[in-house]
Amino acid sequence: MNYDVIIIGGGHAGVEASLASARMGNKTLLISMLAENVGATSCNPAIGGLAKGHLVREIDALGGEMALITDEAGIQFRILNQTKGPAVRGSRAQIDMDRYRVIARNKILNTPNLELVQEMAESLIIEDGEVKGVKTNLLNEYSAKRVIVTSGTFLRGVIHVGEIKQIGGRYGEQSSDALSASLKSCGLEMGRLKTGTCARVDASTIDFSVMEEQGGDELPNPFSFRTNREEFRKTKKQIPCYITYTNQNTHDIIESNFYRAPMFTGQIEGRGPRYCPSIEDKINRFRDKERHHLFIEPQTLENTECYINGMSTSLPPDVQQLMINSVKGMENAKIVRYGYAIEYDFVDPRELKHTLETKKIKGLYLAGQINGTTGYEEAAAQGLMAGINASLSLQGKEPFILRRDEAYIGVLIDDLVTKGTKEPYRMFTSRAEYRLLLREESADTRLSHYGHTFGLIDDENYERVKAKEAQIQEGARILRETIFTPNKEFIAFLNSIGEEGVRDTISAEQIVARKSFDVSKMLKLIPEFEMYESYILDEILVEGKYARYVQKQSEEIQKMKKYLKVEIPQNFAFRSISGLSKEIVEKLESFNPPTLQAASQISGITPAAIEILHIYIKIDIKNRNK
């Protein structure tokens, strides 16, 4: 049984990797332990969020499926951080978890060149440092030129619920111990991480009337640029989430049972996600907090079960029931599924190239939680990139590597492969130095030309993106070139829309840059913009408001590209540089990087440190040439 590409694991990374591979013309096999769980959302019933929404839109722009599935399975859509700048706003959707999985599986089953088989991959076939295929638990051998491992939390997975430990990669499913051993035998450095999930509660036993209702946006925006926006808004049915809070009684119940918490007893060894702590960890670390938010999220459109966001736990079942019942609105709530923690093996992502191919084994790619990340979106992004790069390598083409100034996906992969991680890695807008250039709404105009080149975005959708980009550029040009003089009529106009007058000649771009200027005012200033759709107007306004900042950031990028090529002189005296911390100096001395590019890839070396180093290198060269 011969294939071009084999993907091991049918989670979010596996779905994107297998679809990309098959659509790029490769005979592809997806191996999954349970065929019905392909595309399953193991934890929260939501896609997107701050920075994660950026990833979903970038996946979409490159031709991935996550956004399209979310638009179809979504039951509530919101833009987070709406009052903040456009660079840090994030789209988030509640999804029908059952529907999401069905849609994902159907896409897999109906894609040409792609086969799905329910088996457990147990070992990799390696010959002379190159992957040749996969052996399964049913003693089948599948040959392939490229293999992508997207194993999620299944590598030597151990589930913890109070004092109880059991082997499993997800509750009710087996772990993959043999595959973990096979990866280790390849010489890959591996570690141990932990994640967790909360209890699911019978929705009919919750009193929503005493909770705060949290609805979706009145005019919901789809995730995918390929989804018809107007039709989506007309037909999309949304249901609310609810907010309640823990209280002192909740905290007392949890604290009095710390001695039974696996994360405190030493039962759990793996490090958990810093930014998604368990409720027992929150109570322990933030003892001054009188309460913590809990978001009650429906898992399906029918709302039969609710996910208690903010209450991830591995406490024993009896304690989970007590703490749930201590919360307002859940006094009579009944748990359907208990929360648990799970420990699993991961591969140090510094073992990877930027293509996500391993450095030690040719043709072997890794994507998702196996690389130390947490989150559906981070996994899907890696899966897509691995699928694309595996395909390009088979075609003898150049690898596809996104830069940090091109995409959040570029930031994600660069962080992983250059810095590694000791805890589950989550994407944040703060990780992106060039976030003004990487807004959610610009993902399609930034990246869809790549997706089109790879054959993952069709001509019709690509032409639509080009038309959008042309309209935005034309609007931005009009703002730049429309000049107003400070005469009485113009000042009176500004005053009439609640704006202060001007003393000097001014461009429309300068006027819309004012904080108080919105789309309605821009339409009065430039009436010809009435021909544009609302989402185009939003982008034109953003272009106008941030033009000078974007220009400055673009100049910084060009400057950085130029001096990253600069060589660091041999035996350079790093300790003579003022402005560098002791930690940075020690790392530079330890690694002794040959260029600024190499120095920038050392964990903990900041862009500011690179700039300082560049200045001192120029001084050193100048002194040597005297």
Swiss-Prot record:
Keyword vocabulary terms for this entry: Cytoplasm, FAD, Flavoprotein, NAD, tRNA processing
Binding-site list for FAD: 9-14
An individual GO BP term: tRNA methylation
Subcellular location(s) per record: Cytoplasm
UniProt binding sites for NAD(+): 272-286
The UniProt record lists the keyword NAD: yes
A GO MF term: flavin adenine dinucleotide binding
Cofactors, names only: FAD
Keyword NAD: yes
InterPro entries per record: FAD/NAD-bd_sf (IPR036188), GIDA_C_N (IPR049312), MnmG (IPR004416), MnmG-rel (IPR002218), MnmG-rel_CS (IPR020595), MnmG_C (IPR026904), MnmG_C_subdom (IPR047001), MnmG_C_subdom_sf (IPR044920)
Superkingdom, taxonomy of origin: Bacteria
UniProt GO cellular component terms: cytosol
Pfam short name (any one): SAM_GIDA_C
UniProt cross-references to NCBIfam families, sorted A to Z: mnmG_gidA
Function: NAD-binding protein involved in the addition of a carboxymethylaminomethyl (cmnm) group at the wobble position (U34) of certain tRNAs, forming tRNA-cmnm(5)s(2)U34.
Self-association and partners: Homodimer. Heterotetramer of two MnmE and two MnmG subunits.
UniProt similarity note: Belongs to the MnmG family.
Name assigned to this protein: tRNA uridine 5-carboxymethylaminomethyl modification enzyme MnmG
Record gene name: mnmG
